[in-house]
Protein backbone atom coordinates (compact mmCIF):
# COMPACT_ATOMS: atom_id res chain seq x y z
CA UNK A 1 0.00 0.00 0.00
CA UNK A 2 2.98 2.33 0.27
CA UNK A 3 3.46 5.12 2.79
CA UNK A 4 0.70 7.50 3.92
CA UNK A 5 0.54 11.23 3.29
CA UNK A 6 1.39 12.66 6.69
CA UNK A 7 -0.04 16.05 5.73
CA UNK A 8 -3.33 16.84 4.04
CA UNK A 9 -2.88 17.24 0.31
CA UNK A 10 -5.22 17.50 -2.64
CA UNK A 11 -4.80 13.78 -3.34
CA UNK A 12 -4.63 12.40 0.21
CA UNK A 13 -7.99 10.71 -0.25
CA UNK A 14 -6.49 8.63 -3.09
CA UNK A 15 -3.48 7.34 -1.11
CA UNK A 16 -4.04 3.60 -0.47
CA UNK A 17 -2.29 3.67 2.91
CA UNK A 18 -4.36 6.65 4.08
CA UNK A 19 -7.52 4.90 2.93
CA UNK A 20 -6.56 1.72 4.79
CA UNK A 21 -5.53 3.46 8.00
CA UNK A 22 -8.57 5.74 8.23
CA UNK A 23 -11.03 3.10 6.99
CA UNK A 24 -13.50 5.92 6.46
CA UNK A 25 -14.94 4.95 3.09
CA UNK A 26 -16.61 1.61 2.38
CA UNK A 27 -15.94 1.52 -1.36
CA UNK A 28 -12.32 2.69 -1.36
CA UNK A 29 -11.46 0.55 1.69
CA UNK A 30 -12.76 -2.50 -0.15
CA UNK A 31 -10.78 -1.57 -3.28
CA UNK A 32 -7.42 -1.26 -1.51
CA UNK A 33 -7.79 -4.22 0.85
CA UNK A 34 -9.87 -6.83 -0.95
CA UNK A 35 -12.85 -8.69 0.44
CA UNK A 36 -10.97 -10.88 2.95
CA UNK A 37 -8.78 -8.17 4.46
CA UNK A 38 -11.71 -5.73 4.38
CA UNK A 39 -13.86 -8.15 6.39
CA UNK A 40 -11.09 -8.78 8.91
CA UNK A 41 -10.17 -5.11 9.36
CA UNK A 42 -13.79 -4.02 9.55
CA UNK A 43 -14.34 -6.55 12.35
CA UNK A 44 -11.19 -5.34 14.11
CA UNK A 45 -12.06 -1.64 13.86
CA UNK A 46 -15.64 -2.22 14.97
CA UNK A 47 -15.26 -4.78 17.75
CA UNK A 48 -11.63 -5.36 18.78
CA UNK A 49 -9.68 -2.12 18.41
CA UNK A 50 -8.85 -0.80 21.85
CA UNK A 51 -11.30 1.77 23.06
CA UNK A 52 -10.06 5.04 24.49
CA UNK A 53 -9.65 4.91 28.25
CA UNK A 54 -11.22 7.47 30.52
CA UNK A 55 -9.04 10.44 31.40
CA UNK A 56 -10.00 12.44 34.48
CA UNK A 57 -8.71 15.71 32.99
CA UNK A 58 -10.89 15.17 29.93
CA UNK A 59 -13.98 14.72 32.08
CA UNK A 60 -13.18 17.82 34.12
CA UNK A 61 -12.82 19.81 30.90
CA UNK A 62 -16.21 18.60 29.65
CA UNK A 63 -17.87 19.19 33.02
CA UNK A 64 -16.68 22.80 33.09
CA UNK A 65 -17.49 23.34 29.42
CA UNK A 66 -21.08 22.17 29.58
CA UNK A 67 -21.82 23.99 32.82
CA UNK A 68 -21.08 27.39 31.32
CA UNK A 69 -23.87 29.96 31.32
CA UNK A 70 -25.94 30.44 28.18
CA UNK A 71 -24.61 33.33 26.09
CA UNK A 72 -26.81 33.42 22.99
CA UNK A 73 -29.08 36.40 22.39
CA UNK A 74 -32.09 36.92 20.17
CA UNK A 75 -31.69 38.93 16.97
CA UNK A 76 -33.88 40.19 14.14
CA UNK A 77 -33.78 36.73 12.54
CA UNK A 78 -34.98 34.87 15.63
CA UNK A 79 -38.20 33.07 14.76
CA UNK A 80 -38.36 34.60 11.28
CA UNK A 81 -39.39 31.25 9.77
CA UNK A 82 -41.22 29.87 12.80
CA UNK A 83 -43.65 27.05 11.91
CA UNK A 84 -42.52 26.99 8.27
CA UNK A 85 -41.85 23.66 6.66
CA UNK A 86 -38.14 23.03 6.21
CA UNK A 87 -36.39 21.36 3.29
CA UNK A 88 -32.65 20.85 3.56
CA UNK A 89 -30.90 19.97 0.31
CA UNK A 90 -27.39 18.57 0.57
CA UNK A 91 -25.80 18.86 -2.87
CA UNK A 92 -23.37 16.20 -4.02
CA UNK A 93 -20.21 17.87 -5.34
CA UNK A 94 -21.84 21.08 -6.59
CA UNK A 95 -18.79 23.30 -6.27
CA UNK A 96 -19.07 27.10 -6.39
CA UNK A 97 -17.96 27.29 -10.01
CA UNK A 98 -20.81 25.00 -11.06
CA UNK A 99 -23.54 27.37 -9.91
CA UNK A 100 -23.96 29.63 -12.93
CA UNK A 101 -26.89 31.17 -14.74
CA UNK A 102 -26.19 28.92 -17.72
CA UNK A 103 -25.49 25.55 -16.07
CA UNK A 104 -27.70 25.67 -12.99
CA UNK A 105 -30.24 28.49 -13.44
CA UNK A 106 -32.57 27.42 -10.63
CA UNK A 107 -29.83 27.16 -8.02
CA UNK A 108 -28.27 30.37 -9.31
CA UNK A 109 -31.52 32.29 -8.95
CA UNK A 110 -32.25 30.88 -5.50
CA UNK A 111 -28.74 31.62 -4.25
CA UNK A 112 -28.90 35.22 -5.46
CA UNK A 113 -32.36 35.81 -4.03
CA UNK A 114 -31.87 34.35 -0.58
CA UNK A 115 -29.54 34.61 2.38
CA UNK A 116 -26.25 33.81 0.67
CA UNK A 117 -23.24 32.82 2.79
CA UNK A 118 -20.45 33.64 0.36
CA UNK A 119 -17.53 32.64 2.58
CA UNK A 120 -18.64 29.12 3.44
CA UNK A 121 -16.46 26.02 3.83
CA UNK A 122 -17.15 22.31 3.92
CA UNK A 123 -15.06 19.79 5.83
CA UNK A 124 -12.66 17.57 3.95
CA UNK A 125 -12.01 14.49 6.07
CA UNK A 126 -10.66 12.09 3.45
CA UNK A 127 -13.17 9.45 2.36
CA UNK A 128 -16.74 9.75 3.50
CA UNK A 129 -16.90 13.53 3.20
CA UNK A 130 -20.54 13.31 2.13
CA UNK A 131 -21.59 11.62 5.36
CA UNK A 132 -19.34 13.91 7.39
CA UNK A 133 -21.48 16.82 6.18
CA UNK A 134 -24.66 14.95 7.11
CA UNK A 135 -23.20 14.32 10.55
CA UNK A 136 -22.18 17.96 11.06
CA UNK A 137 -25.46 19.50 9.94
CA UNK A 138 -27.58 17.07 11.94
CA UNK A 139 -25.60 17.00 15.19
CA UNK A 140 -23.50 20.18 15.23
CA UNK A 141 -20.27 18.16 15.49
CA UNK A 142 -17.73 16.83 12.99
CA UNK A 143 -15.66 13.71 12.65
CA UNK A 144 -12.89 13.84 15.30
CA UNK A 145 -9.56 15.29 14.26
CA UNK A 146 -7.37 14.10 17.15
CA UNK A 147 -8.23 10.42 16.72
CA UNK A 148 -9.60 8.24 13.93
CA UNK A 149 -13.22 7.15 14.08
CA UNK A 150 -15.68 7.08 11.20
CA UNK A 151 -18.57 9.50 11.51
CA UNK A 152 -21.07 6.75 10.79
CA UNK A 153 -19.84 4.64 13.74
CA UNK A 154 -21.16 7.15 16.29
CA UNK A 155 -24.62 5.62 15.96
CA UNK A 156 -24.45 4.43 19.57
CA UNK A 157 -23.82 7.96 20.83
CA UNK A 158 -26.72 9.97 22.16
CA UNK A 159 -27.67 13.15 20.26
CA UNK A 160 -30.75 14.55 22.05
CA UNK A 161 -30.14 18.04 20.64
CA UNK A 162 -29.91 17.03 16.99
CA UNK A 163 -31.89 18.78 14.28
CA UNK A 164 -34.47 16.00 14.08
CA UNK A 165 -35.07 15.70 17.82
CA UNK A 166 -35.58 19.44 18.29
CA UNK A 167 -37.93 19.79 15.31
CA UNK A 168 -39.93 16.75 16.37
CA UNK A 169 -40.39 18.42 19.75
CA UNK A 170 -42.10 21.21 17.78
CA UNK A 171 -44.54 18.81 16.11
CA UNK A 172 -42.73 18.22 12.82
CA UNK A 173 -42.30 14.93 11.00
CA UNK A 174 -38.67 14.54 9.94
CA UNK A 175 -37.61 12.32 7.03
CA UNK A 176 -34.50 11.86 4.89
CA UNK A 177 -34.42 11.04 1.16
CA UNK A 178 -31.51 9.78 -0.94
CA UNK A 179 -30.66 7.46 -3.79
CA UNK A 180 -28.63 4.92 -1.85
CA UNK A 181 -29.64 2.19 0.55
CA UNK A 182 -30.12 2.55 4.29
CA UNK A 183 -27.12 0.24 4.81
CA UNK A 184 -24.66 2.53 3.03
CA UNK A 185 -22.73 4.49 5.69
CA UNK A 186 -25.22 2.84 8.09
CA UNK A 187 -27.56 5.70 7.24
CA UNK A 188 -30.68 3.87 8.36
CA UNK A 189 -29.24 3.32 11.84
CA UNK A 190 -27.68 6.79 12.09
CA UNK A 191 -30.72 8.74 10.97
CA UNK A 192 -32.91 6.84 13.41
CA UNK A 193 -30.39 7.60 16.15
CA UNK A 194 -30.54 11.30 15.26
CA UNK A 195 -34.31 11.21 15.68
CA UNK A 196 -35.59 10.91 12.12
CA UNK A 197 -38.91 9.22 11.54
CA UNK A 198 -37.58 7.51 8.41
CA UNK A 199 -34.65 7.29 6.03
CA UNK A 200 -35.82 6.53 2.48
CA UNK A 201 -33.50 5.24 -0.27
CA UNK A 202 -34.63 4.90 -3.87
CA UNK A 203 -32.69 1.65 -4.19
CA UNK A 204 -34.47 0.24 -1.14
CA UNK A 205 -37.84 0.61 -2.87
CA UNK A 206 -36.93 -2.29 -5.16
CA UNK A 207 -39.10 -0.90 -7.96
CA UNK A 208 -36.43 0.16 -10.46
CA UNK A 209 -35.68 -2.20 -13.35
CA UNK A 210 -32.58 -0.19 -14.28
CA UNK A 211 -30.25 2.26 -12.51
CA UNK A 212 -32.20 5.42 -13.34
CA UNK A 213 -32.37 6.02 -9.58
CA UNK A 214 -28.95 7.69 -9.88
CA UNK A 215 -30.63 10.66 -11.56
CA UNK A 216 -31.59 13.36 -9.07
CA UNK A 217 -34.89 13.99 -10.83
CA UNK A 218 -36.10 10.68 -9.38
CA UNK A 219 -36.00 12.16 -5.88
CA UNK A 220 -39.02 14.24 -6.90
CA UNK A 221 -40.56 12.27 -9.77
CA UNK A 222 -40.76 9.02 -7.84
CA UNK A 223 -44.38 8.81 -6.68
CA UNK A 224 -43.57 7.03 -3.42
CA UNK A 225 -40.98 9.65 -2.48
CA UNK A 226 -43.32 12.45 -3.47
CA UNK A 227 -46.07 11.07 -1.26
CA UNK A 228 -43.73 10.63 1.71
CA UNK A 229 -42.27 14.13 1.37
CA UNK A 230 -45.55 15.99 1.53
CA UNK A 231 -47.98 13.75 3.41
CA UNK A 232 -47.77 15.66 6.71
CA UNK A 233 -48.84 19.18 7.61
CA UNK A 234 -45.55 20.22 9.25
CA UNK A 235 -42.48 18.56 7.81
CA UNK A 236 -38.71 18.61 7.66
CA UNK A 237 -37.26 16.88 4.59
CA UNK A 238 -33.52 16.24 4.32
CA UNK A 239 -32.72 15.55 0.66
CA UNK A 240 -29.30 14.26 -0.41
CA UNK A 241 -28.52 14.49 -4.13
CA UNK A 242 -26.23 12.14 -6.02
CA UNK A 243 -25.92 12.75 -9.77
CA UNK A 244 -22.81 14.97 -9.67
CA UNK A 245 -20.76 12.01 -8.46
CA UNK A 246 -17.65 10.62 -10.11
CA UNK A 247 -16.74 9.46 -12.74
CA UNK A 248 -16.91 12.48 -15.04
CA UNK A 249 -16.58 10.74 -18.39
CA UNK A 250 -18.72 9.65 -21.31
CA UNK A 251 -17.31 6.13 -21.07
CA UNK A 252 -19.43 5.22 -18.04
CA UNK A 253 -21.40 6.71 -15.18
CA UNK A 254 -23.94 9.49 -14.93
CA UNK A 255 -22.51 11.70 -17.68
CA UNK A 256 -22.93 8.91 -20.21
CA UNK A 257 -26.45 8.21 -18.99
CA UNK A 258 -27.46 11.87 -19.30
CA UNK A 259 -26.00 12.22 -22.80
CA UNK A 260 -28.08 9.24 -23.86
CA UNK A 261 -31.24 10.81 -22.44
CA UNK A 262 -30.42 14.11 -24.14
CA UNK A 263 -30.00 12.46 -27.54
CA UNK A 264 -33.18 10.40 -27.22
CA UNK A 265 -35.19 13.44 -26.16
CA UNK A 266 -33.80 15.74 -28.85
CA UNK A 267 -34.47 13.18 -31.59
CA UNK A 268 -37.73 11.79 -30.19
CA UNK A 269 -36.31 8.26 -30.03
CA UNK A 270 -36.72 5.37 -27.60
CA UNK A 271 -33.43 3.63 -28.38
CA UNK A 272 -30.03 4.82 -29.55
CA UNK A 273 -29.13 4.06 -33.18
CA UNK A 274 -26.74 1.13 -33.49
CA UNK A 275 -24.12 3.39 -35.07
CA UNK A 276 -24.39 6.06 -32.35
CA UNK A 277 -21.03 7.12 -30.94
CA UNK A 278 -20.86 9.01 -27.66
CA UNK A 279 -19.09 12.36 -28.03
CA UNK A 280 -15.85 12.99 -26.23
CA UNK A 281 -16.21 15.43 -23.34
CA UNK A 282 -13.82 16.85 -20.80
CA UNK A 283 -14.26 16.15 -17.11
CA UNK A 284 -15.38 19.75 -16.66
CA UNK A 285 -18.06 19.45 -19.33
CA UNK A 286 -19.36 16.25 -17.77
CA UNK A 287 -19.40 17.84 -14.31
CA UNK A 288 -21.43 20.74 -15.68
CA UNK A 289 -23.89 18.37 -17.39
CA UNK A 290 -24.28 16.33 -14.22
CA UNK A 291 -24.78 19.49 -12.16
CA UNK A 292 -27.52 20.51 -14.59
CA UNK A 293 -29.40 17.34 -13.61
CA UNK A 294 -29.25 18.35 -9.95
CA UNK A 295 -30.56 21.76 -10.93
CA UNK A 296 -33.43 20.09 -12.77
CA UNK A 297 -34.31 18.31 -9.53
CA UNK A 298 -34.45 21.68 -7.76
CA UNK A 299 -36.74 23.01 -10.49
CA UNK A 300 -39.04 20.01 -10.03
CA UNK A 301 -39.04 20.55 -6.26
CA UNK A 302 -40.08 24.20 -6.58
CA UNK A 303 -42.79 23.26 -9.07
CA UNK A 304 -44.13 20.62 -6.68
CA UNK A 305 -44.20 23.10 -3.80
CA UNK A 306 -46.02 25.61 -6.00
CA UNK A 307 -48.64 23.07 -7.09
CA UNK A 308 -49.27 22.10 -3.47
CA UNK A 309 -49.46 25.76 -2.39
CA UNK A 310 -46.52 25.23 -0.03
CA UNK A 311 -44.00 27.66 -1.45
CA UNK A 312 -44.77 30.57 0.87
CA UNK A 313 -44.57 28.53 4.07
CA UNK A 314 -41.52 26.43 3.21
CA UNK A 315 -37.90 27.43 3.76
CA UNK A 316 -35.17 25.70 1.76
CA UNK A 317 -31.62 25.40 3.09
CA UNK A 318 -29.02 24.41 0.49
CA UNK A 319 -25.35 23.53 0.95
CA UNK A 320 -22.75 21.35 -0.76
CA UNK A 321 -21.21 18.33 0.96
CA UNK A 322 -17.66 18.92 -0.32
CA UNK A 323 -15.73 20.60 -3.11
CA UNK A 324 -15.34 18.54 -6.27
CA UNK A 325 -12.20 16.72 -5.12
CA UNK A 326 -13.14 13.63 -7.14
CA UNK A 327 -11.98 15.19 -10.42
CA UNK A 328 -8.91 13.49 -11.86
CA UNK A 329 -7.70 16.70 -13.53
CA UNK A 330 -6.74 19.17 -10.81
CA UNK A 331 -6.11 21.93 -13.35
CA UNK A 332 -9.89 22.32 -13.59
CA UNK A 333 -10.00 23.33 -9.94
CA UNK A 334 -6.93 25.54 -10.42
CA UNK A 335 -8.97 27.66 -12.84
CA UNK A 336 -11.74 28.39 -10.37
CA UNK A 337 -10.45 27.96 -6.82
CA UNK A 338 -7.54 28.54 -4.49
CA UNK A 339 -6.00 25.07 -4.45
CA UNK A 340 -2.73 25.38 -2.53
CA UNK A 341 -4.32 25.27 0.94
CA UNK A 342 -7.55 24.26 2.66
CA UNK A 343 -9.45 27.22 1.25
CA UNK A 344 -10.09 24.82 -1.61
CA UNK A 345 -12.99 23.68 0.61
CA UNK A 346 -14.95 26.83 -0.29
CA UNK A 347 -18.50 25.71 -1.19
CA UNK A 348 -22.05 27.10 -1.56
CA UNK A 349 -24.48 27.64 1.32
CA UNK A 350 -27.70 29.64 1.13
CA UNK A 351 -31.16 29.85 2.67
CA UNK A 352 -34.11 30.59 0.40
CA UNK A 353 -37.67 31.60 1.23
CA UNK A 354 -39.46 32.30 -2.06
CA UNK A 355 -37.25 35.29 -2.94
CA UNK A 356 -38.42 37.20 0.16
CA UNK A 357 -35.15 37.60 2.03
CA UNK A 358 -32.13 38.70 0.05
CA UNK A 359 -28.92 39.21 1.98
CA UNK A 360 -25.22 38.49 1.57
CA UNK A 361 -23.28 37.19 4.58
CA UNK A 362 -19.53 37.64 4.11
CA UNK A 363 -18.41 36.26 7.48
CA UNK A 364 -16.74 32.84 7.39
CA UNK A 365 -19.11 29.92 7.98
CA UNK A 366 -18.87 26.13 7.88
CA UNK A 367 -21.15 23.11 8.14
CA UNK A 368 -20.99 23.59 11.92
CA UNK A 369 -22.94 26.86 11.63
CA UNK A 370 -25.85 25.40 9.69
CA UNK A 371 -27.76 23.80 12.58
CA UNK A 372 -27.65 26.67 15.12
CA UNK A 373 -28.50 29.16 12.35
CA UNK A 374 -31.57 27.10 11.39
CA UNK A 375 -32.67 26.72 15.01
CA UNK A 376 -32.57 30.49 15.55
CA UNK A 377 -34.47 31.20 12.33
CA UNK A 378 -37.21 28.83 13.48
CA UNK A 379 -37.33 30.26 16.99
CA UNK A 380 -36.56 26.86 18.50
CA UNK A 381 -35.13 27.10 21.99
CA UNK A 382 -31.68 25.56 22.20
CA UNK A 383 -28.53 25.74 24.30
CA UNK A 384 -25.84 27.32 22.15
CA UNK A 385 -23.06 25.67 24.13
CA UNK A 386 -24.29 22.27 22.98
CA UNK A 387 -22.85 22.91 19.52
CA UNK A 388 -19.41 23.72 18.16
CA UNK A 389 -20.60 26.40 15.74
CA UNK A 390 -22.91 29.33 16.43
CA UNK A 391 -25.72 31.22 14.71
CA UNK A 392 -24.14 32.89 11.69
CA UNK A 393 -26.86 35.58 11.64
CA UNK A 394 -26.13 36.75 15.18
CA UNK A 395 -25.27 40.44 15.51
CA UNK A 396 -21.95 39.63 17.19
CA UNK A 397 -20.97 36.73 14.95
CA UNK A 398 -17.35 36.67 13.78
CA UNK A 399 -16.69 33.37 12.10
CA UNK A 400 -13.76 31.09 11.57
CA UNK A 401 -13.30 27.62 10.17
CA UNK A 402 -10.73 24.99 11.09
CA UNK A 403 -9.60 22.05 9.01
CA UNK A 404 -8.40 18.51 9.60
CA UNK A 405 -4.72 19.53 9.71
CA UNK A 406 -5.55 22.16 12.38
CA UNK A 407 -5.08 25.06 9.96
CA UNK A 408 -7.78 27.72 10.17
CA UNK A 409 -9.20 30.78 8.46
CA UNK A 410 -11.19 33.74 9.81
CA UNK A 411 -11.77 35.71 6.63
CA UNK A 412 -8.67 37.84 7.10
CA UNK A 413 -5.83 35.42 7.76
CA UNK A 414 -5.12 31.78 7.00
CA UNK A 415 -3.01 30.10 9.66
CA UNK A 416 -1.14 26.85 9.09
CA UNK A 417 1.18 25.30 11.65
CA UNK A 418 0.37 28.14 14.03
CA UNK A 419 1.73 30.86 11.73
CA UNK A 420 0.05 33.20 9.26
CA UNK A 421 0.59 31.95 5.72
CA UNK A 422 -2.00 34.13 3.99
CA UNK A 423 -3.07 37.65 4.92
CA UNK A 424 -1.42 40.35 6.99
CA UNK A 425 0.57 39.46 10.09
CA UNK A 426 -1.23 40.13 13.37
CA UNK A 427 -0.07 40.71 16.94
CA UNK A 428 1.65 37.60 18.29
CA UNK A 429 -0.49 37.50 21.44
CA UNK A 430 -3.68 37.78 19.40
CA UNK A 431 -2.47 35.00 17.13
CA UNK A 432 -1.67 32.85 20.15
CA UNK A 433 -5.17 33.44 21.53
CA UNK A 434 -6.78 32.51 18.23
CA UNK A 435 -4.67 29.37 17.89
CA UNK A 436 -5.67 28.41 21.42
CA UNK A 437 -9.35 28.97 20.63
CA UNK A 438 -9.23 26.74 17.55
CA UNK A 439 -7.55 23.97 19.52
CA UNK A 440 -10.15 24.41 22.26
CA UNK A 441 -13.00 23.94 19.76
CA UNK A 442 -11.38 20.80 18.36
CA UNK A 443 -10.83 19.44 21.86
CA UNK A 444 -14.46 20.10 22.79
CA UNK A 445 -15.66 18.44 19.60
CA UNK A 446 -13.50 15.35 19.92
CA UNK A 447 -13.96 14.73 23.65
CA UNK A 448 -17.72 15.22 23.53
CA UNK A 449 -17.97 12.45 20.96
CA UNK A 450 -15.33 10.24 22.59
CA UNK A 451 -17.12 10.14 25.94
CA UNK A 452 -20.66 10.23 24.53
CA UNK A 453 -21.11 13.19 26.86
CA UNK A 454 -24.63 14.15 25.82
CA UNK A 455 -25.82 10.83 27.20
CA UNK A 456 -24.53 11.92 30.61
CA UNK A 457 -26.09 15.37 30.25
CA UNK A 458 -29.46 13.88 29.31
CA UNK A 459 -29.37 11.38 32.18
CA UNK A 460 -28.71 14.21 34.65
CA UNK A 461 -31.55 16.27 33.21
CA UNK A 462 -33.95 13.34 33.45
CA UNK A 463 -33.07 12.86 37.13
CA UNK A 464 -34.02 16.47 37.90
CA UNK A 465 -37.43 16.20 36.21
Where are each of the predicted segments found?
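Alpha-helix initiation/capping motif
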Residues: 20-33, 51, 156, 212, ...
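Transmembrane and membrane-interface helices of multi-pass
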Residues: 1-42, 105
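Solvent-exposed soluble domains appended to multi-pass membrane proteins
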Residues: 60-465
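N-terminal, intrinsically disordered, polar/charged segments of Gram-positive cell-envelope systems
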Residues: 29-79
